[in-house]
Amino acid sequence: MKGYYNFADIEKKWQDKWEKDGLYKTQEETDKDNYYVLEMFPYPSGNLHMGHVRVYSIGDVIARFKRMNGYNVLHPMGWDAFGLPAENAAIKHGNIHPQDWTWDNIKNMKKQMKSLGLSYDWDREVTTAKEDYYKWTQWFFVKMFKKGLAYKKKAAVNWCPGCETVLANEQVVNNACERCGTEVEEKELEQWFFKITNYAERLLEDHKLLQNWPEKVKIMQRNWIGRSEGMRIKFPVKGSSEEIEVFTTRPDTIFGATYMVLAPEHPLVEKLISGTEKEKEVRQFIDRVKKQKEMERTSPESEKEGLFTGAYAINPMTGEEIPIMIANYVLMGYGTGAIMAVPAHDQRDFDFARKYDLPIRVVIQPEEREEELKDTDLNEAYEGSGHLINSDKYNGLTVKEAFDVMAEDMEKEGIGKREVNYRLRDWLISRQRYWGTPIPIVYCEKCGTVPVPEEELPVVLPRDVEFSPTGESPLAKVDEFVNTTCPVCGGKARRETDTMDTFVDSSWYFLRYTDPKNDKLPFSKENAKKWFPVDQYIGGIEHAILHLLYARFFTKVIYDMDMIDSVEPFTNWLAQGMVLKDGAKMSKSKGNVVDPEDILDRFGADTARLFILFAAPPEKDLEWSDRGVEGAERFLNRVWRLVADNIKEIKNTDQASLDVNSFNKNEKDLYRNLHVTIKRVTEDIGERLNFNTAISAIMELTNATYQYLNGVEKVNYTLIKDIIEKMLLILAPFAPHMTEELWSELGNDESIHIQKWPGYEEKALKKDEVTIVVQVNGKVRDKLQVSADIDEDKLKEQVLELPRIQKYTEGKEIVKTIIIPKKLVNIVVK
């Protein structure tokens, strides 16, 4: 055996053997309990980065640990292969076809993953850009279309000029495309949507089922869904049969509503201005506002602009005529596209009222204020709580009381009704790009919008396409794709040429892994029942809203189709931190990228894995350190030498079992250290996911073993054999190659990774002796080594016999003796 860990030879040897033996292949029929661990699958960019190494190493430790603990583990991997990044990269890299570019990248990244020693069942690999996968993405679309959950409408959409496509609201960050950073524009286009708003309440309500999700993630989702309880109230338009409906969370302030505001796009505007002297001026204003971006219109810093329409509404509670304005800060896509403006108690309304000299009426009196609050007292809106004033019979009621009483009265009088509203908007899934799942819809002049029959799926993405972005869907230029026959009447028809948002592909992939070869269904209910929901999901916090919300939505839709038994996809979710270098996220522009391939070439996979798991708790950001990597390498070589230096004696040990009762003190201490370590590592991996402290415990055990070997005259090699074998078993999930090699060198034929995880003995955890701190009047005066099970009288006796204690107690009265078992004795004297 060599005196050091030669990773270059050893790691490849075992990777090949594991693959040949099918060591990590998931068993379908077994009497073991099933466990499903999954890391978010990657977009095939071409190369792994350190963030990938971290998340996959975390998942791999859990998978290996669960296998050794007797579970039948599903640990698959696949590729989120469609979407803009692949298409943009293909264009950038010399007009290579996106499919070729993607397939090459998958091949390279798969090789890199294998070189990390990750225990994936590659027989279950899925690729979202392959027909055998996107056939079923289309199948789900058709099912959702038939249920009214997929629909097309004209909408103001976020348009990215850089990517030449539409973005969902969630993909716009600070008015820029999250992918390329280009400033986003608004366009009106016919687009496909999924009706995620139908599931808003369930998405909120079912957060209670996610006990093992980070609370901050649930808060982010709650804020995004934005549930608000309020009232939908009707304001009649003076001199007309028309009514303006508003949604408000503050019906208690209706007596302070002194004007109405409509979004410039509101359909009623046309009726109000048509043929009036205001028509020209209002139309010019509308044209100007339409050029403003939604983000710009709603920003608190943006100037509030408006115009009087010339029409009036009637406040249904006061009978008062109030002017109807249009303004840039009210959007048609939110609420009803109209608001009742209460300037005394809403800052935007206040700013607007001051600017256009509109009336301000205070209707909420702060509790702590003695004098009645008047509009002339206000420099800004009062948005706090209090009781009602200037509100007729409701005066004196608190805000909360008034909400309920006024809501009841308005419902009785038919003025309004209670309603729950959501900030969440339907999910826009249309993309005007090539590299995505074709939307399985045809348009027939006679039959209208028709879904492609399920038996005709998949609608195959053609290869011969000019996919450079022009703003129009590239598929629209492919006549043989576009021109088809109507599945209903057989007449001429045209295919939909938009493709789906890549988030659709990743919203159900975790279910396909349960039955990846099924060509009759996306998966069978029987197979899904065995594995679903995912027991442990791992991925970045940046996916808290987009991917995780969409995956939860899809799961509920599929549950309603009676295909699965769970309404939530992921029982436990771990959001791993980023890998930083020099305090910043790694990026080429910052010049602080650490290439995993370089690290694997220099140090090997086990060292890379060990460092990245040891350097920080998994949920925290990790600072890359070359010295830390070298430290991980040194530790692995210490373990290697521990085996190499003692292997001859260990193999010659003929005693089959340990005689614990014959141990001397040094042997007892080392044996106890072993079992304390097993307990700690078991709990750190299995309960807390604290891999860094688990590795630290193994390091401490290694040090203790060396200290024993170097400090005794006669070594108990039966004990050393037991310690080394168990140490290798608990180190195996972290350093799979080296432990496999050492396990084999010790004469074991079966892989270490299918061995039983070692248990710890409760009896061995107990100390035979404990150190007692001895105090006199609360000050430490001595320490005493005693038997762990000594009784209190005997302990007192031994304490009082200590010369240093007698020095402080002699000639004094002992008032009392305080004993904290196995820790402390405090003698109180006077």
UniProtKB/Swiss-Prot annotation:
A motif ('KMSKS' region) lies at residues 585-589. GO terms for cellular component: cytosol. It is an enzyme of class 6 (ligase). GO terms for molecular function: aminoacyl-tRNA deacylase activity; ATP binding; leucine-tRNA ligase activity. It is found in: Cytoplasm. A motif ('HIGH' region) lies at residues 42-52. Signal peptide: none annotated. Its EC number is 6.1.1.4. The keyword Iron does not apply. GO terms for biological process: leucyl-tRNA aminoacylation. It catalyses: tRNA(Leu) + L-leucine + ATP = L-leucyl-tRNA(Leu) + AMP + diphosphate. InterPro entries: aa-tRNA-synth_I_CS, aa-tRNA-synth_Ia, Leu-tRNA-ligase, Leu_tRNA-synth_edit, M/V/L/I-tRNA-synth_anticd-bd, Methionyl/Leucyl_tRNA_Synth, Rossmann-like_a/b/a_fold, tRNAsynth_Ia_anticodon-bd. Keywords: Aminoacyl-tRNA synthetase, ATP-binding, Cytoplasm, Ligase, Nucleotide-binding, Protein biosynthesis. Its main location: cytoplasm. The keyword Cytoplasm applies. It comes from the Bacteria. ATP binds at residue 588. This is Leucine--tRNA ligase. The lineage of its organism: Bacteria, Bacillati, Bacillota, Clostridia, Halanaerobiales. The gene is leuS.
